């Protein structure tokens, strides 16, 4: 039965949607700072991790590269922020006070230290880390260079791009010249002129364009 359905799909006139692979590719070397510190013998994820960056913003769902022993960083929060639902195999010893009956010596009750309930071992609810400050992401290996690269990228992003003023095209200059030649300074008439103002530009827009045209040295030329 399944084979017959497969044959029917193969005979279907609907073409299968095929995505071009190049449409999904990204250029990791688009930035000069990243390109200068890129290592060709490492993968994209390895390079980004070393530079203190991330290749994806979504949560990791699996298939990540396992780190070698000793490469775990104390400053890394990747494992600290993970919530494990599994029951721990080894329980850490804790201290508690015991109240006994003075006559029989039997234990009446056990008094534990006041501590918030944390059955899922959520580090965000842990009292042990309340006094610790955030120490940043990433590995200790190459942390100095990573911080320098991140600082350079942040400085580059903070610099405002050079703003270039829009230049009027030749056709726009000719259009403004026709308006000024016919109506002079009467901007209201320019707005109502359906022949010279078919796009229904507003009075303030035409006034701004005319002023910019005059500042650039625009003058009405006499017809030959």
Swiss-Prot record:
Record field: compositional bias (Basic residues): 8-25
GO cellular component terms attached to this protein's record: nucleolus; preribosome, large subunit precursor
Stretches for region Disordered: 1-27, 110-173
Taxonomy, superkingdom: Eukaryota
Pfam families: Nop16
Location within or outside the cell: Nucleus, Nucleolus
Biological process, per Gene Ontology: ribosomal large subunit biogenesis; rRNA processing
Main location, first listed in the record: nucleus
Amino acid composition bias (Acidic residues), ranges on this chain: 125-142
Keywords: Nucleus, Ribonucleoprotein, Ribosome biogenesis, rRNA processing
Basic and acidic residues biased stretches: 148-173
Entry similarity comment: Belongs to the NOP16 family.
Assembly mode: Component of the pre-66S ribosomal particle.
PANTHER family in UniProt: HSPC111 PROTEIN-RELATED (PTHR13243), NUCLEOLAR PROTEIN 16 (PTHR13243:SF1)
Functional description taken from the UniProt entry: Involved in the biogenesis of the 60S ribosomal subunit.
Protein name as catalogued: Nucleolar protein 16
């Amino acid at each position: 039965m399944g084979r017959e359905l497969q044959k029917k799909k193969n005979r279907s006139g609907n073409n299968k949607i095929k995505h071009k692979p190049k449409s999904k590719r990204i250029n990791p070397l688009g930035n000069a700072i990243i390109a200068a510190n890129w290592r060709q013998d490492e993968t994209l994820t390895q390079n980004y991790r070393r530079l203190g960056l991330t290749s994806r913003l979504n949560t990791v769902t699996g298939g990540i590269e396992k780190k070698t022993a000793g490469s775990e960083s104390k400053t890394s929060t990747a494992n600290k922020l993970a919530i494990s639902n599994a029951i721990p195999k080894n329980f850490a010893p804790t201290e508690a006070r015991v109240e006994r009956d003075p006559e029989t010596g039997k234990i009446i009750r056990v008094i534990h230290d006041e501590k918030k309930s944390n059955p899922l071992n959520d580090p965000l609810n842990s009292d042990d880390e309340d006094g610790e400050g955030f120490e940043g992401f990433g590995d200790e290996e190459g942390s100095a260079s990573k911080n320098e690269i991140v600082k350079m990228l942040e400085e580059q992003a903070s610099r405002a791009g050079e703003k270039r003023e829009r230049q009027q095209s030749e056709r726009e200059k000719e259009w403004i010249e026709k308006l000024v030649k016919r109506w002079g300074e009467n901007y209201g008439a320019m707005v109502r002129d359906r022949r010279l103002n078919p796009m229904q530009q507003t009075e303030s827009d035409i006034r701004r364009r005319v002023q910019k045209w005059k500042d650039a040295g625009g003058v009405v030329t006499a017809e030959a």
